[in-house]
Design a protein with these regions (language model features):
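A broadly tuned preference for mixed-charge, low-complexity surface segments
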Residues: 1-5, 41, 66, 128-140, ...
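A C-terminal junction/extension of Radical SAM enzymes
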Residues: 90-167
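Context-gated lysine
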Residues: 3-4, 20, 28, 88, ...
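Detector for Asparagine
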Residues: 13, 18, 48-50, 134, ...
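Conserved non-cysteine loop/helix-boundary elements of the Radical SAM core domain that shape
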Residues: 1-115
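Radical SAM enzyme core and accessory elements
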Residues: 143-209
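Short, glycine-/Ser/Thr-/acidic-enriched flexible segments
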Residues: 56, 134, 170-173
């Protein structure tokens, strides 16, 4: 469907390529599924694939980050977005912090530099940077891309000058009007409710016509 509708850039986001960490933070995908999805996308002709990773996840140090970066280097994506871990209020980690008291949350210059060097080896350069609240190590998120593959959309949405059409449960559509007025249109979060109310979710976006 994506190829049929001429989608030219997609994201396949592992967050980490360490299965132990994925299980710990409640992510339901596996490392193998990430690799399979990437190879499938390549075989279908997608030539601008971004991958997001998070540095500073619980229990991860230089060795774990190296494992993730080596896996990404083998896959050879066109963009990599390196996120410094930020604890969000609604995330599993924030809601169950008592379960993680014995686990360290680390992000350091050394770890960030290892990620940076991998991106350089892949022929990428940094093209955008932004920060969030509660970020590990007081670092920032950095987008890297090969020549001609930068996700300009990322910059536009961070500057809030680009309308966004969101599909699916929990999606948040954003409409930017002339003069800078912004209107958000939220989809319901529960998947079953979204399916049951799909016509309503569509009607909410009539403002985009």
């Amino acid at each position: 469907m994506l190829k049929k509708h001429r989608v030219s850039r997609i994201s396949i986001n592992p967050q980490t390529m360490n299965q132990k960490t994925l299980d710990l933070i409640g992510r339901k995908h596996t490392v193998e599924q990430t690799e399979e999805a990437f190879r499938l996308a390549r075989s279908m002709g997608f030539d601008n694939i971004n991958m997001d990773l998070i540095v500073g996840l619980p229990g991860e140090g230089p060795e774990e980050v190296d494992r993730t970066m080596c896996a990404l280097e083998r896959l050879d994506p066109d963009d990599i977005t390196v996120h410094a871990f930020a604890l969000k209020r609604a995330a599993r980690l924030a809601l169950h912090m008592d379960e993680y008291e014995s686990i360290s949350f680390r992000a350091s210059d050394e770890i960030m530099e290892r990620a940076h060097q991998t991106c350089r080896r892949l022929g990428m350069t940094p093209y955008y940077l932004y920060r969030q609240k509660n970020m590990a190590g007081n670092f920032e998120n950095v987008g890297y891309a090969k020549s001609g593959h930068a996700g300009i959309y990322n910059i536009l949405i961070m500057e809030e000058v680009q309308s966004i059409l969101a599909l699916g449960a929990s999606g948040s559509t954003k409409v930017i009007y002339p003069g800078g007025r912004i209107e958000r249109i939220e989809n319901v979060k529960d998947v079953r409710s979204y399916l049951d109310r799909i016509d309503e979710m569509i009607r909410r976006k009539d403002v985009l016509r």
